[in-house]
Amino acid sequence: MYPFFTYSPGRHYFEYKWYNLELLRLIGSAPYGGCDAAEFLELVASLKPNDADEWHHKFLALAERTQAKGEQMSEAGHEAVARGAYLRASNYFRCAQYMFPIMPAARQGEFLKLYHRSIRSFEQAAELMEHRVERVSIPFQPPEYRAPAVELPGWLHLPAAHQRLSGRKTPLLICVGGADSTQEELYFLSAAEGPGLGYAILTFDGPGQGLTLRESGVPLRPDGEVVIEAVLDFIESYAAEHPEADLDVDAISITGQSLGGYLALRGAADPRIKACVAVDPIYDFYDLAMSRMPRWFMWPWERNYMGDGFVDFAVIEHSKLDVATKYTFAQGGQMFGSASPAQMIRDMKQYTFRLDKTITASKRHGNNRDYLEWVTCPVFVTGAAGDEKLFLPEMSTSAIMRNLANVPDEHKELWIPKEWSEGGAQAKSGAWPLLQHRCFKFLDEKLGISRGAKPVQLKTGFVKGVNGHGLTNGGLNGALNGATNGITNGVH
């Protein structure tokens, strides 16, 4: 059967193609303690392709073993390794519940409990972090008539006293999640580095994300700016009520990855946002989806020659053979609040910056043709060229750069790497340390933060070489010669 979502033949390291980005996403968190190489390799070697139950059980077993290690390490007073174990357990529990959208309704409660275990493990890790981590609740009142208010759960990462920037208040970065990320996972994309650089980091589960979707049942909103408005209001209130945090409400920036990049850009139109980093964002969700679907099938549906039932039937039948297709439509349906696969595809049309394609455009945005014309703050936009058939920078990244008409060229920056090690995978999976370097370098520049070069100074004689010589001059030569001789003798 024709695959609904196509992939290029290259850059696949696992037998089942869909696992490539998902597992790269996991191993990519290793530099910040979210994964262990040996644990990862052992699991992947035994993982059956195209099997959601196998995925769930393997990751659950690994998560429980890792959590137990964390408890043992914590009891022994070994805080650093315990923190790492808790972070890994949190990430493995996230993976264990990842397939929840395609599980029967009777098992949804079971998978929600696993999600809470992921949160609890993260909380245990947070208690052992160098910086302060605070659980927060962000009030959000949807603008629709009689829509119930909801509390958005969040984590606020605050730099410790010795990590704060000298001579100024603490800037804050809002980190927006993507389609299926959890805010605990966002730690590896922003909060792992931010506090150490003097930034406060706020992550949260917005509508259609994390607990806000799973427990409150609130679907995603195409007008992400109304959510960011509530988040900004919360930050201002928090800063006023907690002067000890020393937050700079005039130095708030925002970032997001993939779909989160789209939401971050919508939020960047608020004048309280002073800079935006949009990581591999989407310009028009529907157009991107159509580029990855068989045109011979979708063309008659788009022109009403074929009803929704044909699309629904094709998706359901293909989902029986392919977990990736089943997950994509199940996750998207829950996220959007769509009643059927065809409706989910139709709902994608609202996720665009083209104002002439959205229902509320004329009411809210005057004569502008593109929402991005409202963004005036400095913007760093990235693309992912590592798999041209999966994500198309020319359809999203390039279109976004063209339509940021009111951002001066000197305040726009573009980065489209190709190799995965350089950030060529979607959401920069596998290159998160490099992403954070580029992100905070841009924010430092635009927010006027000067750090100065701090070259590493080596202390003479600090390390002892072979035969007791220091690693300087003759001591270094002696150490190298001794090591070389040892290796040579061992080989022969």
Swiss-Prot record:
Stored InterPro entries: AB_hydrolase_1 (IPR000073), AB_hydrolase_fold (IPR029058), FrsA_esterase (IPR050261)
Keyword annotations: Hydrolase
Enzyme Commission number(s) from the entry: 3.7.1.-
GO MF term set: hydrolase activity
Database matches in SUPFAM superfamilies: alpha/beta-Hydrolases
Active site: 258 (nucleophile)
Pathway: Mycotoxin biosynthesis
Gene3D superfamilies per record: acylaminoacyl peptidase, alpha/beta hydrolase
Any one Pfam family match given in the protein's UniProt record, by short name: Abhydrolase_6
Subunit structure: Homodimer.
Family of this protein: Belongs to the AB hydrolase superfamily. FUS2 hydrolase family.
Record's function text: Alpha/beta hydrolase; part of the gene cluster that mediates the biosynthesis of UCS1025A, a member of the pyrrolizidinone family that acts as a strong telomerase inhibitor and displays potent antibacterial and antitumor properties. These compounds share a hemiaminal-containing pyrrolizidinone core fused with a gamma-lactone, giving a furopyrrolizidine that is connected to a decalin fragment. The polyketide synthase module (PKS) of the PKS-NRPS ucsA is responsible for the synthesis of the polyketide backbone via the condensation of an acetyl-CoA starter unit with 6 malonyl-CoA units.
Protein name: Alpha/beta hydrolase ucsC
Species of the source: Acremonium sp
Lineage start: Eukaryota, Fungi, Dikarya, Ascomycota, Pezizomycotina
